A protein has these predicted regions:
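N-terminal export signals
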Residues: 5-23
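Ser/Thr/Asn(+Pro)-rich, low-complexity disordered segments
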Residues: 27-462
């Protein structure tokens, strides 16, 4: 494993953070380190991107020449798009190279089979064909439209359209049929259990049925789909108030919430919160970092809602830090769904700040992308945590970035890098190094006119 260059590059930043070097020198050292991390992370995304322009799900970095996986998803493709825009914005590639990469991906997306205006959940990253059998096992793959995965592809396409006016008309045509009301069940006060005013998880096209669940928890990554639909007018603004800050107090959940019933924009809702280590917050579903903090990489929730979302994001990060360093005593923190270091995929989180009774537990597995998501809210602590992971476990692959996860109890480091997680790393670094770089499409138009007023009225009661 190629570790030496990273550790040498990180030494100056680490010393600056730890020893209080003069401010200007510390800033230069830290920025150089973050730019190095971005550059290498972008190289990993390039390595995952196939000849037709689709970013595959993952790469195994144990070989000298990492090979992309067969499968990809709409989320992975979106990650490739916004990472390319970020690379140009940070000077890693020039504008011409950005255009070539975006154009290749947009052309591939134009050819992908769709249904009801949305993209299927699994494609062959090398051919663009819808997957009907899972690579390696041959298990059947049902054709499925995922609301949240489509949201991340649409986000990537909007970022690409904003960055490259030449591609904008083609992307607008692609998005013309993406009507989020397809996933929405309008609210019915006479039967809110069957008609909750929320988004379905998805739709099976082989038998024309929706999933049996809705995305009810507000502080989770599917709220990106909600914001997109409200912004483009395909979802009513009151849909936002029909999502849960916590479950209703009489429902079984991780802890009994405190709060009160309030009426906002004509919607009667439970304004609830949890308390963790003396800290009031609105929980996510499982207590993971990406549920809470992937969306604000793009939608400026903290600045549009400083007393609600802004406070909650910081408290979510602080809770993760204290869970890892104090409650469990791991010496490291950052818990979010990731590759299992020994193989496979699992959800990790801080159980106490998630609504689900089962929750996501930390199990001693930290994932670097969680620290990057925290970086806009706790920069120095996130950088120090990442440097410790690189130093103590060899978690950094020179030229490609951080491996996906580390079991800090055993020292086992994942052999893989995942497109989703590297895409979050790239977006987080873009936000830290060039604030707002990927947020332009989500600060204007319907986002400014319809989403921002909702967030301004948000009051979590914390």
């Amino acid at each position: 494993m190629k570790r030496r260059t990273l550790l040498a590059a990180g030494a100056g930043a680490s010393a600056a953070l730890a020893l209080g070097s003069p401010a200007a020198a510390a800033a230069r050292d830290t920025e150089a380190l973050l730019r190095r991390w971005f550059r290498d992370t972008y190289r990993s995304i390039e390595a995952m991107t196939t000849g037709i322009g689709l970013t595959a799900d993952k790469i195994d970095v144990t070989s000298a020449d990492p090979v992309p996986s067969v499968n990809t998803s709409p989320t992975n493709i979106g990650c490739g798009l916004w990472s390319t825009v970020a690379a140009a914005g940070l000077g890693v590639i020039d504008t011409r190279t950005m255009h070539r990469g975006l154009a290749r991906t947009v052309a591939a997306v134009e050819r992908l089979e769709r249904a009801h205006g949305f993209w299927f959940n699994w494609y062959d990253a090398h051919t663009g064909a819808v997957l009907t059998e899972w690579p390696g096992t041959g298990d059947p793959v049902r054709p499925f439209l995922s609301s949240v995965d489509n949201a991340w592809l649409v986000a990537g396409l909007l970022i690409a359209a904003d960055a490259d006016p030449v591609l904008r008309p083609r992307i607008e045509r692609l998005l013309a049929d993406a009507d989020w009301s397809f996933f929405h069940t309008p609210y019915d006060a006479d039967d809110p259990a069957a008609n909750p005013g929320q988004l379905r998880g998805g739709f099976w096209t082989d038998d024309d049925t929706y999933t049996g669940h809705w995305y009810g928890a507000l502080n989770t990554e599917p709220r990106m789909a909600s914001y997109l639909g409200i912004a483009d007018g395909s979802l009513p603004p009151e849909h936002y108030w029909h999502t849960f800050r916590t479950m209703l107090p009489e429902w079984e959940q991780e802890q009994r919430p405190e709060g009160e019933y309030v009426t906002v924009d004509g919607v009667r809702m439970w304004r609830g919160h949890y308390t963790y280590r003396g800290r009031r917050l609105v929980p996510s579903w499982g207590g993971s970092m990406f549920e809470a903090l992937m969306v604000p990489l793009f939608v400026p929730e903290a600045s549009w809602s400083p007393k609600a979302w802004g406070v909650n994001h910081r408290r979510h990060v602080r809770s993760q830090i204290e869970h890892g360093l104090v409650e469990e005593g791991y010496g490291y923190w950052g818990f979010s769904p990731a590759n299992i270091p020994d193989g496979g995929y699992s959800e990790y989180g801080v159980d106490a700040i998630g609504m689900s009774v089962e929750g996501y537990t930390s199990k001693g597995v930290v994932t670097p992308h969680a620290s990057f998501l925290a970086m806009p809210f706790a920069r120095d602590e996130a950088i120090a945590n990442l440097l410790r992971m690189a130093r103590d476990f060899g978690a950094y692959e020179d030229g490609l970035g951080f491996r996906d996860s580390v079991d800090v109890r055993t020292g086992r480091v994942s052999d893989f890098m995942l497109a989703l997680d590297q895409g979050m790393v790239a977006a987080a670094l873009a936000q830290v190094l060039s604030p707002g770089l990927l947020q332009r499409p989500f600060r204007t138009g319907g986002f400014a006119a319809r989403v921002r007023p909702l967030l301004a009225r948000e009051d979590f009661g914390i």
